[in-house]
């Protein structure tokens, strides 16, 4: 039940916080010649974080000449893979919820539904682990590439001590951090559901039968051996008890000598 409720929600939070992100930073370059300064340089970037395609112009503080720069890095592969896994996990969890509720008989027919569900759950657990780990590394690269201090190092005007370069504000990465958290939460949720799905498959029931058959055989052989021992003991005890009493011959034997003193006379 937890899987039905939380899997679609966690998947939505994962791809929404990552795929819907857009942010930026603002820098300022104050040249010695104030007419050449630019105190508001806005650099915007968004999903899928192809930062090498994000270009911007900054003053060189050498006349009216301007320098065209671009951010460094490309984290699009890890970000797109993460969002793709989240979208497909959301769609599958919705479809599985509909099947669980409305097509329970079809789901358990020939044990095909539980087997498919088990395989898909294992696959998505692996994909969530790989996707979340890759996106965590990609997010780390995005943070470094969009750090205002790193961007200022790209500007030739900022290498001259007479010019003043500073960051006005940095990009907000809280939603991207949340996406990584939800990615690993999805992995924990799907991996924890593997055992519950496995219990519904025929593999689990066949394994239990395989373990119970030798135990039943062992217990039946033990009971049979105990019965034979009891039978043997009761029969031997009966023979011993029968041999304790006197025989009919012993009771029937008459004395051969005289029975009275008068007869002797």
Swiss-Prot record:
Protein name per its UniProtKB record: Synaptoporin
Classification via InterPro entries: Marvel, Synaptophysin/porin
KW Glycoprotein (keyword) present: yes
Domain MARVEL: residue ranges: 1-202
Biased composition (Low complexity): 224-243
Gene name, Swiss-Prot/TrEMBL: SYNPR
Record family assignment: Belongs to the synaptophysin/synaptobrevin family.
Glycosylation sites: 33, 38
Topological type in the membrane: Multi-pass membrane protein
Species: Homo sapiens
């Amino acid at each position: 039940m937890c899987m039905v409720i939380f899997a679609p929600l966690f998947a939505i939070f994962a791809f929404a916080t990552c795929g819907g992100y857009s942010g930026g930073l603002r820098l300022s370059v104050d040249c010695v010649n104030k007419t050449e300064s630019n105190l508001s340089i806005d650099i915007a970037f968004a999903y899928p974080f192809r930062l090498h395609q994000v270009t911007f112009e900054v003053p060189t503080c050498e006349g009216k000449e301007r320098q065209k720069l671009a951010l460094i890095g490309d984290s699009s592969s890890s970000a797109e893979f993460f969002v793709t896994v989240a979208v497909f996990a959301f769609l599958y969890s919705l479809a599985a919820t509909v099947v669980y509720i409305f097509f329970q008989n079809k789901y358990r027919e020939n044990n095909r539904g539980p087997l498919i569900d088990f395989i898909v759950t294992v696959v998505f657990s692996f994909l969530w682990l790989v996707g979340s780990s890759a996106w965590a590394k990609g997010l780390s690269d995005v943070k470094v590439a969009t750090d205002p201090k790193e961007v200022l190092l790209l500007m030739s005007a900022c290498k001259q001590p007479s010019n003043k370069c500073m960051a006005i504000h940095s990009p907000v990465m809280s939603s991207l951090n949340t996406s990584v958290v939800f990615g690993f939460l999805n992995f924990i949720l799907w991996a924890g559901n593997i055992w519950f799905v496995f219990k519904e498959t025929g593999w689990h029931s066949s394994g239990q039968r395989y373990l119970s058959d030798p135990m039943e055989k062992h217990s039946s052989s033990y009971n049979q051996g105990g019965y034979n021992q009891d039978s043997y003991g009761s029969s031997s005890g009966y023979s011993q008890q029968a041999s304790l009493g006197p025989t009919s011959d012993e009771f029937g034997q008459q004395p051969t000598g005289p029975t009275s003193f008068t007869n002797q006379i």
